[in-house]
Regions:
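N-terminal capping/small domains of soluble enzymes
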Residues: 1-103, 108-110
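Alpha/beta enzyme core
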Residues: 43-44, 110-141
């Protein structure tokens, strides 16, 4: 006798249909490829993956030490380290399997023009949605 199949966890958020209400937030799994390296997990386990914060130009991020372990978890101050939107769109996105889950870009900038230009680069990409990051506390600008 086989176990009954679980009920669907599908949800709709802002017109975007997700197979599950579980969304991996920006930075948790980099640009998505890290998640599939964890044994027993796949992109189909989540409704969406929000990519690591992406800026118009590459950023080195903050100098070390950027991660601090606490008794209740960890704190980080990565500083939006990323290869820049051109590399994300041209090299990283083509390596992701968009048939398995939804992908949401996290767009960061220092000026309105940065946000506009970074968002424009995602227009013709397979990204399902864009999240605007206006609150990263780990950068000086």
């Amino acid at each position: 006798m086989s176990a009954p199949l679980p009920a669907s966890l599908a949800v709709e958020f802002c017109g975007l249909k997700l197979a599950s209400p579980i969304v991996l937030l920006s930075g948790c799994v980099g640009f998505g490829e890290e998640y599939t390296r964890v044994e027993g997990f796949s992109n189909t386990d989540v409704g969406a993956i929000v990519l690591k914060g992406t800026t118009r130009e590459p950023r080195l991020g903050n100098p070390p030490h950027r991660v601090y372990e606490t008794p209740m978890g960890m704190l980080n101050a990565i500083g939006l380290q990323n290869p820049g939107v051109d590399k994300v769109v041209d090299e990283i996105l083509p390596s992701l399997d968009f048939s398995e889950t939804r992908f949401i870009a996290n767009v960061c900038g220092s000026t309105i023009e940065d946000y506009v230009e970074t968002t424009r680069r995602f227009e013709d990409s397979p990204i399902d949605a864009i999240e605007i990051n206006i609150s990263c506390p780990n950068i000086k600008e």
